[in-house]
């Protein structure tokens, strides 16, 4: 049976509640003519729910269907829980609808690893391209980099998001191999260099969208 948009939102918002979102964007950008929304430092998130979610962001996963089986993660493939996946169009339209109703000030987007890191990031990029390009969304976007994603895709993600971050789950390579056998130390740390580089170039690129 096909899931409704509300069913997907309920599942994927709940699955995102353990992902850490910073409340300060570090970005300052006024609205441009013809765009919707703006982004001002020190960020657009100031109210929190009891479980740590920032209530002025739509904090959601692209999907909670994961190819990995990390023992600490609620979305691991061996866990028996409801699964859902947004299409890029569904999530972009949902974000805009919430924004127009003044429910949110921006989007926090993360994802489980569907098929592969690159495939997952391509779908996240499709959402951001719709928001920035077709819908002229100028609000705050925080995207989570998926470990193992190619540098080229991370660079594109950096052009479109105000903030990029990556989860570093464990302090040692031995612990990582025990608890997250599908991940490697280098796949986690590798995204950090492109993140800092792409941030410097992102705002210039956005001017031409």
Q: What are these regions, as identified by a protein language model?
A:
Residues 53, 103-105, 137-139, 160:
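Short, well-ordered coil/turn segments that N-cap beta-strands
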Residues 107-126, 178:
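Conserved glycine-rich "GG(E/T)P / GGGxP" loop and the immediately following alpha-helix
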Residues 65, 78, 113-116, 148-150, ...:
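Conserved radical SAM core fold
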